[in-house]
Swiss-Prot record:
Similarity field: Belongs to the RNase HII family.
Lineage: Bacteria, Bacillati, Bacillota, Clostridia, Eubacteriales
Full protein name: Ribonuclease HII
Gene: rnhB
Molecular-function GO term, any one: manganese ion binding
One Pfam family linked to the record: RNase_HII
Length: 255
């Protein structure tokens, strides 16, 4: 599957403008221009979706993950099926958005989506199967919870084994596909909420601030408190810290 040029659907392009509540009489010219530019940008982000539609697929799911890099917390994946006329101004790769913007967009994506699902794999299992396999399992769980069942998958970089649905892994897909961008936002927002909830269950680590990433604050709390059930013991420096504790050694986290 390859798409180099935007595959605009002119009828849908016009319908979005005509039907959108954003285009009400009296809207300022600057806002109108912004929204028109967003229509064009988002239609361009649908190029892979349109190619799949043109090949006879009706339900196309975008899939992405959040939380592969942290040393604590689950890896989470989201799967989203959007309609052909989906329009959500501001949608983009979640990494390019503020937390507040992501939260607002997530609510709108859930409102407009045909179906959406989020799944998680926690460290107790992640450490047994490795982060790549844990990511795949979270993605598979998210896909299986969609209804209707998707007929085609657009996935950010990862190939999913053991699933009888046609798929296309797209490098940097969260910047190239509107469906993957939507999934990236949902996965990130839901994971952040999970880590904020765990902050009260495991006080002192600062999970609500760093979300499990290896910040200096987090590493200092590890030295002070030791590990908790959320920490990934297969990830460094947690692995060395756990091994050091077993043999009476103190890891040098800041060398």
């Amino acid at each position: 599957m390859r798409s180099e040029q935007p595959l605009y659907n002119k009828r849908l392009f016009s319908d979005i403008i005509d039907k959108s509540t954003h285009f009400k009489e009296g809207l300022g010219l600057d806002k109108q221009k912004y929204l028109l530019d967003e229509v064009k940008r988002i239609e361009d982000l649908k190029r892979y979706e349109y190619e799949a539609y043109n090949n006879g697929f009706r339900y196309i799911a975008g899939i992405d993950e959040a939380g592969r890099g942290p040393i604590a917390g689950p890896v989470m994946a989201a799967a989203v099926i959007l309609s052909r006329d989906f329009f959500c101004p501001g949608i983009n790769d979640s990494k390019k958005l503020t937390a507040l913007k992501r939260s607002k967009l997530a609510a709108e994506i859930k409102k407009q989506a045909i179906s959406w699902s989020v799944a998680a794999v926690f460290p107790s299992y992640l450490d047994k199967v490795n982060i790549l396999n844990a990511t795949r399992e979270a993605m598979l769980l998210a896909v299986k919870n969609l209804s209707p069942r998707p007929e085609f998958l657009l996935i950010d970089a990862v190939q999913l084994p053991d699933i009888d649905i046609k798929q296309y892994p797209l490098i940097k897909g969260d910047s190239l596909s509107v469906s993957i961008a939507a999934a990236s936002i949902l996965a990130k927002v839901e994971r952040d909420r999970v880590m904020e909830a765990f902050d009260s269950l495991y006080p002192g680590y600062g999970f609500s601030r760093h979300k499990g990433y290896a910040t200096r604050e987090h590493l200092q709390s590890l030295l002070r408190l030791g590990t908790c059930a959320l920490h990934r013991v297969s990830f460094e420096p947690v692995k060395s810290m756990v091994l050091g504790a077993r043999y009476g050694e103190q890891p040098a986290l800041f060398e």
